[in-house]
Every structure is written in C-alpha cells, then in structure tokens.
C-alpha cells in the first residue's frame, strides 16, 4: 500500500470555489484508475483556502502511473496547479500496538 497526503493552499480567495469544484470532479476519475484504493479531498472549516487530499494506492507504481491519467492531465495540472501552493507527503499510517508495525 502507498499512502499519500497532499496539503493545498489556494493562493487567491476568488480561486477557492474553482479549486473545490475541480477537486470534486477529480474524485471519480481517480477512483476509476487502476490501483486507486481510495481518494478523498477535504476543505478546512477554519481556513477555507486549505485543502487536504488523502490518497491510498495499491503501490507506489500505481500512484506514479496516476500522473498520466485524465484527473491529473485534464484537471489538476491546468485548473488547480496555477492557483495553489502544495506539500506532498508520502505517508505511513500509524497503527495501534496490536496491529503491528508498518514501517
């Protein structure tokens, strides 16, 4: 499993609704991709210009192949990237002691 957290900050207030709409359109495309286990976008109540993407992929290779898909090529790159700053964090889920280590 390959887990990814992406933290997005929208640069200009008028772009917040545009980014939210684009992210909502990406979801179905991402979920239809080979190896996408789950893909969720969240918007902060406290700071509406902040979004968090939580992605779970079957493998890093599946996530890397995702870059060539329609969600990235037709929505993320042209509609979202020009309006944001982002942090990309490949991540490991912290499990409780009885579940065993993940690292």
What are these regions (language model features)?
Residues 2, 40-49, 75-103:
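Glycine-rich beta-strand-turn "strand-cap" elements at beta-sheet edges
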Residues 2-9:
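Active-site-flanking beta-strand signature of metal-NTP-handling nucleotidyl enzymes
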Residues 6, 19, 39, 53, ...:
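Hydrophobic pocket/interface hotspot
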Residues 9-19:
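Short, surface-exposed ligand-recognition loops at beta-strand->loop->(often short) alpha-helix junctions
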Residues 10, 53, 86:
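Localized chelating/binding microdomains
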Residues 12-13, 47-48, 58-61:
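Short, charged/polar surface micro-motifs in flexible loops or helix N-caps
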Residues 24-52:
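Short, glycine- and small/hydrophobic-rich beta-strand elements in well-ordered beta-sheets
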Residues 31-32, 37, 56-89:
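An amphipathic, aromatic/His-enriched active-site/gating alpha helix that lines ligand/cofactor pockets
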């Amino acid at each position: 499993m390959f887990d990814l957290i992406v933290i997005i900050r929208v640069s200009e207030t008028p772009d917040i609704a545009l980014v939210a709409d684009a992210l909502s359109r990406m979801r179905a495309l991402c979920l239809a991709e080979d190896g996408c286990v789950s893909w969720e976008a969240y918007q902060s109540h406290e700071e509406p210009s902040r979004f968090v993407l939580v992605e779970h992929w079957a493998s890093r290779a599946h996530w890397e192949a995702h870059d060539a898909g329609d969600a990235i090529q037709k929505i993320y790159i042209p509609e979202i990237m020009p309006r944001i700053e982002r942090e990309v964090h490949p991540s490991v889920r912290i499990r409780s002691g009885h579940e065993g280590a993940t690292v």
